A protein has these predicted regions:
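Interdomain/boundary linker segments immediately adjacent to catalytic/signaling cores
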Residues: 32, 46, 63-142
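A general structural detector for well-ordered alpha-helical segments in enzyme core domains, enriched
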Residues: 76, 203-207, 231, 235
């Protein structure tokens, strides 16, 4: 999705600052490497710093035949920030910590001026559009990667359209991730611990309509124990443990690190008042 100028977007007032007359100064300040990095961000939509560095090594170095150091690339990001062409945020998924970069409104106008083409929608912008937050989007991305690398599923999907399950005329369930192997479907919800209890109850009740195994992944043990477990237990009490037992419902909780190590951190199987720890689970929902 190409960028469409919106005067309400975060940008300076062009009529007051003379942005266009300042473009050449910005271009000189960021140098050739900065121009190439801007072109990569505008044309590829890459937001993760590690991916941008790989592109810089593989593409930019190939085009120029000059070696590029990681230090040079990080200085390039500093120059792009100092000229207000990009913004940088830190993301911690519990599995990895990294920076993401995105074009500012001024950066998009700069790209359109020099590259004669509107920037494509970035990964950052897509996550804002599709998910509760950018952080949530990257948690889903890392969870999907783990599940794909395990090789236990024939397909692992995260698209809202393809994952949508109609429950009734007015209600639908859209799991964050759907893993399919043979004729089995596993539904994963990736939690940041930001839902209020009412929203969480609604999510769990919808999932209980479509699956007997409710699978939650979160970023770390702290969020799992302080937020996710509390919310799960409240929902179980509200719906009724015996009712869920009759449905055969189980709730599985894990972190990204535990999932990577083939572990479910806790399981609520409705036959006991307390959750059980169960390690070594290699397929979603298996006991």
């Amino acid at each position: 999705m190409a960028y469409k100028f919106d005067p309400k977007d975060e940008t300076t007032n062009l009529s007051e600052t003379g942005f266009y007359s300042d473009m050449e100064r910005k271009r000189r300040a960021i140098g050739d490497l900065g121009m190439k990095m801007m072109q990569v961000m505008a044309s590829e939509g890459i937001s993760e710093e590690p991916e941008l560095i790989r592109v810089a090594w593989d593409v930019i170095a190939y085009l120029t035949l000059d070696p590029i150091s990681t230090t040079s690339i990080r200085r390039c990001f500093d120059a792009l920030r100092n000229t207000f062409l990009i913004k940088t945020e830190e993301v911690n998924t519990g599995l990895r910590r990294f920076h993401i970069h995105r074009l500012t409104a001024d950066g998009k106008l700069f790209a359109m001026h020099y590259f004669k083409k509107a920037p494509v929608e970035s990964e950052y912008e897509r996550f804002i559009r599709e998910h509760a937050s950018v952080h949530h989007g990257y948690l889903i991305k890392d969870t999907q990667k783990i599940l794909e690398e395990k090789g236990i599923y024939d397909s692992v999907t995260t698209g809202r359209t393809e994952n949508r399950i109609v429950i009734s005329e007015k209600h639908a369930c859209i799991p964050d991730i759907v893993g399919v192997y043979d004729d089995i479907r596993d539904y994963y919800e990736v939690e940041c611990g930001t839902h209020n209890q009412k929203e969480f109850n609604y999510k769990c009740s919808k999932l209980a309509h479509v699956t007997s195994n409710i699978l939650f992944v979160t970023q770390n043990r702290q969020v799992l124990k302080k937020t996710l477990m509390r919310q799960v237990e409240y929902w179980i009490d509200k719906v009724g443990r015996e009712n869920l037992k009759e449905l055969g419902t189980r709730v599985y909780l894990t972190t990204l690190k535990d999932l990577q190590n083939d572990k479910w951190t806790y399981i609520y199987d409705m036959t006991m008042d307390e959750p059980i720890c169960c390690f070594g689970k290699k397929k979603g929902g298996e006991s």
